[in-house]
Amino acid sequence: MTSRYTNTRTESKNSILFATLSSIFGDKMNLARIKFFGLFICALCKVQTVCFEKLAVAFDTDAKVDSSLRRIQRFMAEYMLDNRLIARFVFSLLPHNPPYRLTMDRTNWKFGTSNINILVLAVVYQGVAFPILFKMMPKFGNSSMQERIELMEDFIELFGLQSIDCLLADREFVGDQWLGYLNRRNIRYHIRIKHNFWVNIPRNGHRVKASWLFNSLGIYQYAFHKGIVYVNGQLCYLSASKIKNKQGIPELQIIASFNKPDKAISLYKERWQIESAFKALKTSGFNIEDTHLTDIDRINKLLALVIFAFTWAYIAGVFLDSIRPIKVKKHGRRAKSIFKYGLTYLTSVLFSNDINKFTEICKFLSCT
């Protein structure tokens, strides 16, 4: 009786999940792939690792573990997953309205002699960033100007230029052609530059180091240069603050901006939110670095699935926090992150037989 009851419950839960995913992907993914997708993301939330053997054990199906494992391996090896499907899903669930502040950064790790290097474009939101689009880079080191432009153009094609408020990026993301592209596209940006960059000042013809414009700043002070300047041959505005780096040494944080340099420093601070997302994808969430995959196409599919699960968990956390707010400790920080709050709840529901709660968490996927 218990086994039959459990099987019935499992079938009901899967039916609810598959119906929800079908409403999201429509005719863009066949039913067999939708079923796999659902089983995989649920298993991922349960075991919180990308180890295929552990995921196969957590598949909520009557199939044997070896069969589930082969199913995972076939999906990674053969299926052509369209990243735009995942991007549209994440975009549809964003808990705030456009235009959005975007941030661009890289995440990388090493497995054996293989370097995994991924360029990510994300939407920042209250201490975290939602990865929207990403590009696997077949090399180690910084991204190229062309790779950045392709990622931005993909975003614009999917969601429109009007959905972008500004782009935030670190010192890696500079260069004359890159800034020129952003200027031509009228995309507002706040990008950190190196303090020793040469700056040309049109109003007097002077050529100075960027740091010279702000050498009077004291610790934790900030200022912006009132006139427009040339950096790498491109017109922009500059602002700066003097901060202490990780070693406690004072240094200038100089920001190049399309406009509104008076707001650059406060906006640039939001760039770090993508690091919270990377942490959730890695050690504090799904441990994507545990993968033994080295093939770019397979890692691409795995990352798309992990981003889907991350978004599900975070949206669940937003909902839970709205009805049972996370406690704030004496130092002013939350006792746990919104992401962890949501992931813990999803995991508990997925391990239970509560159909009502399962139906509730499926609604988070369709934003209903």
Protein language model regions, located:
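Single, function-defining residue in the core of a domain
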Residues: 1-51, 61, 86-87, 97-100, ...
